[in-house]
């Protein structure tokens, strides 16, 4: 049995500039971090001659790859030339799907990593992110960008640039104690609201020209966050995390409603900054606040479920049993 696990991510700034329609013209950039919540893939040969897939509450059993309903699994099998081999594939996740935390990118990377190991290959992180990006952006044309497969494959606290020269990430090197303080000032809440990102991203892509000014500002937010982190100005990082949210709300797409506006207002009144991660109204709420403000914010957000998270420095990993 081959196992692979790939971390989910929290975006801070620059998200949506990684979309192909923007990045191929102007270059995109994101700042984000991977967390200790994962997508897991198990893969093994079977003897019944079928492709067996188990994910969420779904069980697919098919004799040929074209009958696989799950787009990402089907295209990963096809790319890895495993379409003629009977295999069992199991998928598990620490958090719900469609949460705005890069789940599809993490899943694609995990699938590819497991399949490479199954074939006796040791892929590099760069290879994984390039193959996963190819499947999500080019093969499936899902309106998604390059960010999620890239940060989930690489891991860590990264600034990643996307342009004609390819995808290149660099670690934002800050002292461990500063990273610990930054992490301690982030609260994470689950709202239970799930939306698909594709409708919003499709609309943004079709109206990209009218959104360019805002997209350029979002791109600058990523560089400003990196600079603030390197300078140790964590409060400015928090402000910029919310600036990403406020700019995103100006774009065409389903990025804002009265619930989002009311939630951010509640958090701001208590001295915090907020962002709902993802290319949509995400299922999670990221809050930056000083330690002294956290209990007040927790009590005021008692209608939401707090989820404990830690930063993870590792990207995708695999093992064989």
Model-identified regions with their sequence ranges:
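C-terminal nucleotide
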Residues: 1-13, 17-24, 32, 38-83, ...
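Active-site signature of cysteine proteases
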Residues: 29
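Residues at or immediately flanking beta-strands
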Residues: 86-88
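Helix-loop-helix module between adjacent transmembrane segments
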Residues: 97-99
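Short, small-residue alpha-helix embedded
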Residues: 105-119, 281-288
């Amino acid at each position: 049995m081959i196992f692979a696990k790939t971390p989910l991510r929290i975006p801070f700034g620059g998200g949506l500039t990684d979309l192909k329609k923007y990045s191929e013209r102007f270059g995109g950039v994101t700042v984000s971090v991977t967390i200790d919540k994962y997508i897991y893939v198990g893969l093994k040969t079977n003897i019944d001659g079928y492709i067996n897939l188990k994910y969420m509450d779904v069980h697919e059993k098919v004799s040929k790859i074209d009958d696989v309903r799950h787009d990402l699994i089907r295209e990963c099998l096809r790319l890895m030339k495993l379409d003629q081999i009977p295999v069992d594939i199991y998928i598990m996740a620490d958090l719900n799907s469609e949460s705005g935390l890069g789940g599809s990118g993490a899943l694609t990377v995990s699938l590819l990593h497991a399949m490479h190991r199954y074939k006796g290959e040791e892929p590099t992180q760069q290879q994984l992110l390039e193959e996963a990006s190819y499947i999500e952006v080019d093969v499936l044309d899902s309106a998604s960008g390059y960010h999620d497969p890239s940060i989930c494959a690489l891991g860590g606290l990264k600034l990643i640039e996307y342009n004609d020269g390819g995808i290149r990430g660099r670690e934002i090197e800050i002292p461990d104690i500063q990273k610990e303080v930054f992490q301690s000032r982030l609260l994470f809440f689950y709202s239970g609201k799930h939306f698909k990102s594709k409708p919003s991203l499709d609309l943004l892509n079709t109206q990209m020209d009218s959104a360019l000014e805002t997209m350029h500002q979002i791109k600058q937010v990523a560089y400003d966050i990196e600079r603030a982190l390197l300078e140790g100005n964590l409060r400015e990082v928090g402000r910029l995390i919310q600036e990403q949210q406020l700019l995103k709300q100006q774009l065409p797409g389903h990025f804002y409603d009265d619930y989002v506006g009311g939630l951010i207002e509640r958090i701001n009144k208590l001295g915090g900054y907020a962002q709902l991660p993802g290319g949509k109204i995400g299922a999670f709420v990221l809050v930056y606040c000083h330690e002294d403000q956290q209990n007040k914010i927790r009590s005021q957000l008692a209608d939401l479920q707090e989820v404990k998270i830690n930063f993870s420095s590792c990207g995708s990993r695999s093992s064989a049993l």
